[in-house]
């Protein structure tokens, strides 16, 4: 059951033998006094949230067995969040039927290993038998010695409460415990057999510890503990309370405290103490603050917040998102060398559900000579995923703890603040400017046109590096590029088509700029580019450029109607740019700057056509405007 359901509704089902007082218990709760005349069975009772201690709407269902079949009972029980098995402390038979009838029936409903909490309710503890024969004071016919073995043998039984509908003893407590059993269940957290935290509880709490360990030293200092306390509960701990916590941990867990700070083992032990002392709500308050549902999985709304991206818009990291991921790099770059080693990278993403940056997709990013991720490559990764896979960005930021601290105590928040939706491209064109930071360049070319070498050059990798890359690698490469002294991110995306007749997807045709690569030594290479251009990009507003590769080889005539230079002139494209050996491995190559320039200023396509390709990297934005104005004047003469 999700947290949303828990907070909205708790469904309590009462079962047990006839005459145990199930209906009387509900009537006493409703009337706040003993009711002599009770109906045979009550319909569903709804208790509003504002009259319950946990502020949850609660429904109580009284199931009678006299006239109902087991199948019907099972169907009703399956809708329950918690089941109260009522027996009479004045009748041994009703106790025996707990194991003979009721617990097996519950397992039929939920399965052999279920997590629906069960509460045993011993009614009629006021000391009457059949409402006539008085029992000795303080003595019940059913002793705890009969109930304890049942609880020990059935771990789904949360607790046992003796009560009396007649004297009102523990009546309200029963339903309070039932609510708590749903909202703060024990079984996901605690293994009754080993008397230890469950593996999934440990995993969740380890994530919490790592997020709260701001300096990544493996300890929670007093400052970090107090920040944790204020984050989860809204109030700080006094210095005395802090010392009491550390003393309690040190007494029971010798490895839990070191250098006057709480270690991971101590943090886990502290929550074990909470649970053993019946303070499950404390641990659950922490877990829910960090996004966990009752299943100890992160909530869907926490991982994947709803967002609408209008057509023509894209997504980028917001300033808050940039600050958060940048701080993570600083936190986990233990040797402060400006790179993340494999162990540092693994440590950073250890709280995520799956490996994030693998050997394959690291080829899309800038690394140092040892293959370690640089700060620039790390930031480029986040910009890439936010543009092409926003869901992945949301999920990873949630696991890394982005929303924590951005909402009130007890609330997990979401990752929406980590991103910004850019203005529609159409508006950018109309306004002759954009505030976008990330731009996508489609790389199109026939097989062996040199696309891999070209793309990997943006990440600073040369021929020897490319030679070690397998055939199956990331189709993306991203890096930071300067556009008139302003940093932008250029994302190259290879189009994997075997022939120009292959269809391109909408995501591919909506790029900011397109680079068509052709091998000057292959007579059939340019035809591929020309065909794709005419089929998908002619008469569009997407800037395009032809790039000649392997220019050191002997140039041959291309098997196309007209040469590449004439083709570009005919379709008003910039002259073909030569990608030579001097450009290989150079992330700061003017070619990448030109691609970024064309993506940032698509409204200046005419300038790109009129200007020499080398001139493009030299002109200022103002000069480009002048050139465009000059063209318009000439056109209108």
Swiss-Prot record:
Positions that bind Ca(2+) 1: 213, 215, 217, 219, 224
Entries under SUPFAM superfamilies matching the protein: EF-hand, P-loop containing nucleoside triphosphate hydrolases
Could you tell me the membrane topology recorded for this protein?
Single-pass type IV membrane protein
Q: Which residues bind GTP 1?
A: 28-35, 74-78, 135-138
Sorted alphabetically, the Gene Ontology cellular component annotations on this record are: mitochondrial outer membrane
- Which Pfam families does the entry mention? EF-hand_5, EF_assoc_1, EF_assoc_2, Ras
Q: Which GO terms describe its biological process?
A: cellular homeostasis; mitochondrial outer membrane permeabilization; mitochondrion organization; mitochondrion transport along microtubule
GO molecular function per UniProt: calcium ion binding; GTP binding; GTPase activity
Q: Provide the protein name.
A: Mitochondrial Rho GTPase 1
State the organism of origin: Caenorhabditis briggsae
């Amino acid at each position: 059951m999700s947290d949303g359901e828990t907070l909205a509704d708790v469904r309590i089902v009462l079962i047990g033998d006839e005459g145990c007082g199930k209906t009387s218990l509900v009537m006493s709760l409703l009337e706040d006094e003993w009711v002599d005349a009770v109906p045979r069975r009550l319909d569903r009772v709804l208790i509003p949230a504002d009259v319950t201690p946990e502020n949850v709407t609660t429904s109580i269902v009284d199931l009678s067995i006299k006239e109902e079949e087991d199948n019907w009972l099972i169907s009703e029980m399956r809708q329950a969040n918690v089941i109260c098995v009522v027996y009479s402390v004045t009748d041994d038979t009703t106790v025996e039927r707990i194991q003979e009838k009721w617990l097996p029936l519950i397992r039929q409903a939920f399965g052999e290993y279920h997590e629906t909490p069960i509460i045993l309710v011993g009614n009629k503890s006021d000391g009457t038998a059949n409402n006539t024969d008085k029992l000795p004071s303080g003595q019940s016919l059913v002793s705890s010695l009969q109930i304890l073995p049942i609880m020990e043998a059935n771990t789904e039984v949360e607790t046992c409460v003796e009560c009396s509908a007649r004297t009102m003893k523990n009546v309200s407590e029963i339903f309070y415990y039932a609510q708590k059993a749903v909202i703060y269940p024990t079984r996901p957290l605690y293994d009754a057999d080993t008397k230890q935290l469950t593996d999934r509880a440990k995993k969740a709490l380890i994530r919490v510890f790592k997020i709260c360990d701001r300096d990544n030293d493996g300890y929670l200092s007093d400052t970090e503990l107090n920040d944790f306390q204020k984050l989860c509960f809204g109030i700080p701990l006094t210095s005395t309370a802090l010392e009491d916590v550390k003393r309690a941990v040190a007494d029971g867990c010798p490895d839990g405290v070191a250098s006057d700070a709480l270690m991971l083992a101590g943090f886990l032990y502290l929550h074990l103490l909470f649970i053993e002392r019946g303070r499950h709500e404390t641990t659950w308050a922490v877990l829910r603050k960090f996004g966990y549902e009752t299943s100890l999985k992160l909530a869907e709304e926490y991982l994947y917040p709803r967002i609408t991206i209008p057509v023509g818009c894209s997504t980028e990291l917001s300033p808050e998102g940039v600050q958060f991921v940048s701080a993570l790099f600083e936190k986990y770059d233990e040797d402060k060398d400006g790179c993340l080693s494999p162990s540092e990278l693994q440590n950073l993403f250890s709280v995520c559900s799956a490996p994030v940056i693998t050997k394959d997709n690291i080829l899309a990013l800038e690394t140092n000579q040892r293959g370690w991720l640089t700060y620039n490559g790390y930031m480029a990764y986040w910009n890439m995923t936010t543009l092409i896979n926003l869901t992945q960005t949301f999920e990873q930021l949630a696991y890394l703890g982005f929303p924590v601290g951005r909402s009130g105590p007890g609330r997990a928040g979401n990752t929406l603040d980590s991103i910004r939706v850019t203005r529609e491209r159409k508006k950018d064109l109309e306004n002759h400017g954009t505030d976008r930071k990330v731009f996508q360049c489609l790389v199109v070319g026939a097989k062996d046109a040199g696309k891999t070498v070209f793309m990997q050059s943006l990440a600073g990798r040369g021929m020897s590096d490319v030679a070690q890359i397998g055939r199956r690698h990331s189709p993306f490469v991203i890096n930071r590029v300067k556009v008139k002294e302003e940093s932008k991110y250029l994302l190259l995306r290879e189009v994997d088509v075997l022939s120009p007749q292959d269809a391109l997807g909408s995501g591919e045709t909506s790029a900011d700029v397109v680079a068509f690569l052709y091998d000057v030594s292959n007579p059939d290479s340019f035809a591929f580019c020309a065909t794709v251009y005419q089929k998908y990009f002619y008469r569009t507003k997407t800037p395009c450029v032809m790039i000649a590769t392997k220019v050191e080889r002997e140039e041959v005539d291309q098997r196309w109607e007209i040469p590449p230079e004439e083709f570009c002139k005919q379709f008003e494209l910039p002259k073909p740019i030569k990608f030579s050996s001097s450009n290989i491995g150079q992330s700061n190559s003017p070619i990448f700057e030109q691609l970024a320039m064309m993506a940032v200023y698509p409204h200046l396509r005419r300038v790109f056509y009129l200007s020499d390709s080398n001139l493009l990297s030299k002109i200022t934005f103002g000069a480009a405007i002048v050139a465009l104005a000059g063209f318009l004047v000439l056109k209108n003469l």
